[in-house]
Regions:
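A general boundary/transition motif marking the beginning of the first structured unit of a protein
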Residues: 42-46, 73, 98, 187
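Active-site pocket-lining segments that scaffold enzyme catalytic pockets across diverse folds
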Residues: 75-81
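A basic- and aromatic-enriched beta-loop-alpha substructure that forms the phosphate/nucleotide-
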Residues: 21-60, 64
Length: 208
């Protein structure tokens, strides 16, 4: 969805936007999308596979109505709205391009690209670790030694980079931080809490 929306914004970019700044944001977005797709594809188990978080949430439903609310609201609607909110800084910057590219844009670009590299490295380290596992264990080497969830750290920094891009319009665009905060709440609060709770139950070497 983010990449599709970005391409749609590009339709009018020559008339309404700063092409260089838009190109920088597009680079970050496509780099992130390639990493995400590759990491999903190499671990895909087929159409019958369902994320354990979805299974857990739906398993708590006591009737069909609760099941519907969980499936439609928590699993589909809220994440989709969170992505739209997180894209606000990027969309705003495309339609209100501000001045020519300056140092803050390069800071945003560096943060965005670095964030995806953090995800790529942490993904590969976890992939290699899981291939040799015979029972649930906690990853404690590489980037995972310094952060419990380095992949999520990269995800948050990725979305934060678009907020930095939006500041090319000045501090008047500061309200767009709401998009980054929304994604932070989804990733760093909701997903992390669920993963840590599950790890405490399954891994004897995991500490809260």
């Amino acid at each position: 969805i983010p990449v599709v929306l970005t391409i749609l914004c590009w339709i009018d970019i020559h008339a309404a936007g700063n092409v260089l700044r838009a190109g920088m944001m597009f680079d970050v977005m496509v780099f992130w999308a390639i990493r995400l797709t590759y990491n999903w594809a190499r671990s895909w188990d087929g159409f019958t596979h369902e994320d354990w978080r979805y299974v857990m949430m739906k398993g708590k439903a006591e009737n069909k109505f609760e099941y519907f609310l969980t499936d439609f609201g928590a699993i589909h609607l809220i994440p989709t709205l969170s992505v739209f909110m997180a894209l606000l800084p990027m969309n705003y910057t495309l339609y209100y391009p501000g001045p020519e590219v300056f140092w803050l844009d390069w800071v945003a670009y560096a943060i965005g690209i670095s964030a995806v590299f953090i995800q790529i490295i942490s993904d590969q380290q976890m992939y290699n670790f899981r291939r040799t596992l015979t029972e649930p264990q906690t990853m404690q080497s590489g980037l995972w030694f310094y952060s419990r969830h380095p992949n999520y750290l990269g995800e948050i920094l990725f979305w934060f980079s678009f907020f930095i891009f939006s500041l090319s319009n000045g501090l008047s665009a500061s309200w767009l931080i709401i998009g980054t905060i929304t994604m932070y709440a989804l990733v760093a609060i909701t997903s992390v809490a669920m993963m840590d709770s599950r790890s405490l139950q399954r891994r004897h070497d995991f500490k809260a």
